[in-house]
Amino acid sequence: MKRPLILLVLILLSLAIWTYQNQAAEENIGIVIADKHKGVCWVGSRNPLEGWELDTLGSFGVSHISQTPFGWQGDPNLPEIKWEEHSDKMWWGESLKGMNTTTSIGREKGIESILKPHLWVRGSWPGTISMETEANWEKWFEQYTAFILYFARFAEKNQTPIVCIGTELEMTSEREENWRKVIQEIRSVYKGELVYAANFTEYQQIEFWDALDYIGIQAYFPLSDKTNPDLDELISSWEKKSKEIEKTVRQYRKPVIFTEIGYCNTEDAAIQPWVWPNERKEIPLSEEVQALCYEAFFQTAWKKDWLAGVYFWKWYPQPRERDPDFTPQNKKAQLVMRSYFSE
């Protein structure tokens, strides 16, 4: 009788060890981030900076800014990407000279920059870009590669630590092999780290995360279906979103950067956070809801080991008195951001 009993004990012990190890693996994904990016999305200025414009960022605990040069596409269904290399019509802060100067000023103040080029699509948004023929797809990727390599070379020369290879190009990211070629081309001229900024509806479908250093998410997740939600509801929503994100993190073993996150100062900010301010003009203003959305994020996703950083949309060189708006500047959300960024 002793032998079967001993065997049973060994089986139960092995099962307990196996269960413990699996639970530990579930709790610890194995990603260790030394210092999270405490970032904001910097708005390129029309005119040259004087230097003081970045002073307040340090006092709010900001460690990084993302700078955004633009390319333009007139029709989302035609391969016609254009960008300005030198033009008097360009805003200074979006030019190579302006971004270089902004980076230098920031570094003097302990603030690093990442580069995040965007495509501006006339009458639409980048997520609708889709070619109707295979020939046009090849032309589009050829043009896009030239566009992103132009800025990757600038980033290499400027010692920019991270380049975002694309932003919200949802219909194009289905073409995995094309994107792998783009990534390969970028790595041939740029030695820093790479991220792709996937729309929150897109990141789970992307299959080339393994070729990048970070999983990037434009984190405009809907958090509520009503105006003026309370903090408990927002926290619950973020906990659910975090569990979904963790599935992708476990699959690819890559840290996440929220390449954008933001909320307007309106009562409906948590319903569809991505909606532009000019579509919210009839909605009552609410600094409280905006601040609660910030608080819910910081109490949940911000604490995750897999989150390498966040960039809040958006921050003006000179504060603007325009409501509604995404910026936390001079609002209650700014105080929430500072309290966590300063920890």
Regions found by a protein language model. Give the residues of each.
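Boundary/entry segment of secreted carbohydrate-active catalytic domains
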Residues: 24-59, 68
